[in-house]
Amino acid sequence: MDAVFHSVNKLLENSFRDNWDRPALSNYQGTTLSYGALAYRIAAMHVVFEKCGLKHGDKVAICARNHSNWAVSLLSSLTYGAIPVPLLHEFKPGNIHYLVNHSESKVLFVDSVIWEGLVPEEMPDVQVVVNIDPFKILYARTEEQKYVQGHIIELFGQKYPAYFGPEHLDYYEDTADELALVSYTSGTSGFSKGVMISYGAIWSNMYLASVAEPQVKAGCEVVAMLPSAHMFGMMFELFYEMVAGCHVYFLTRLPSPKVILKALADIRPCMVICVPLIFEKIYKSKLKPVIDKNKFFFMIPGLNKALEKKIRDELYSSLGGNFEEVILGGAAFNPEVELFLHKIGFPYTVGYGMTECAPIITYAHWDKIKPLSCGRVAPNMEIRIDSPDPRTIPGEVQARGMNVFLGYYKNEDATAKSFTEDGWLRTGDMGVIDDDGFLFLKGRSKCMILGPSGQNIYPEELEAVLNSLRQVVDSLVIDDHGVLTALIYPDWHQASIEGIDPEKLKEQFMQMLPEVNRQLPSYAQIRKIEFMPEDFERTPKKSIKRYLYQR
């Protein structure tokens, strides 16, 4: 890619035309769409949009599990000039209703499981609801819109009477500062923020990928295992691959280590992108036992190198054996695992970013990365550390540049609080930068917890559910070494009046926990409860001093 902005939709258009007969999207162990077939489906969806009255700039919400047709829905919306609003499929129906309404979406793409829990009357702005597998209009508000469902082939034929080919592609031409999509960081009213991502931010992230991963080109195969609605997965398992002419496989099932390893062995991708949890599980189940068993041999010169090479080769082979490097991001990486991978010379790298930067802030190729760092600042970006000595004293990481978001949708106050007075994005992360420009993160200044697959978990949301229970005075949710734990200050006085001892009270809470978790996304399930003998330490404003309880 050139180092100068080009319309993202025109880049997609050119790629579709150039790779017309190549495979584009597949469901793992399922159907495959060529770039030509993908373009055909997009054109058909554009006809549906036109006939249903969708205009450029209207919002299109997408809430479904990972699937090739999820990508078709997103690309159809983007290339039409609409604004996609990807939503995590784990959100509860009430959350989906809220976000669809908050975003003022006119069209909603869903899968059949999501649709079962939704009530169209709760989403008054929505004109049409479309099932993604198979594509079918499930709900239409007007008779004219209902007519479209039974006449799509006829309407498509009217627009393309002879045939549909590469020369018919003419996608919406975007500009760098224009709003491309809205990505919600949460599903709950009062906590959700619609991150407005520009086309320039998407292009800039794709440009980084083209420079950092030149081996990713037309015909390369990639496995999409991250959540499609997550900015990390959307950018580096879909957008860039479509511009590069790659073949993307969607797992369409829970990405357990077993499923992922089987898919990687079958597909043999040119690049592996995943969250650290996958590697940590592989390390604990397969590598750690070997290391512990051979500790003596690791101390013998010559033998240790042979063992390291054997482990490296076996790990490389188990991940398909055809990739340039493994890119990890979306959550913190266990230092023990990372240092071992570095020691054996395994080709991995760790990037750093956030939804508000679409998502990349720093990155380095595996042969340049420093252990425990997150790389160096990405092209078109700058970072600084708010610290008297950025090399030794941790301070907030602040960023500015092309990747930075336009603001939070309909939330000027939150937008203003996200930037410094001189216009730098406040990331909420603490870090230092060494003399070579490598960023080392030291912790988070925000309350947000990163889930195992990179989802944003806001403890205040979970606490709001807990605090609604009659027996709870106040609560605090923490990440206890990967386990979401609720610290609860119960109503000891009321329990005493009712003759309930601590053990009985704990038993009652454990019985209520499944009902609490039913109100929360699958990635934000509370697994452990601990009682506080007395109230939490508080600030003068009566807020809990969270930092005292972190582990």
Which positions does each model-derived feature cover?
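Conserved AMP-binding/adenylate-forming core of the ANL superfamily
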Residues: 4, 13, 21-67, 71, ...
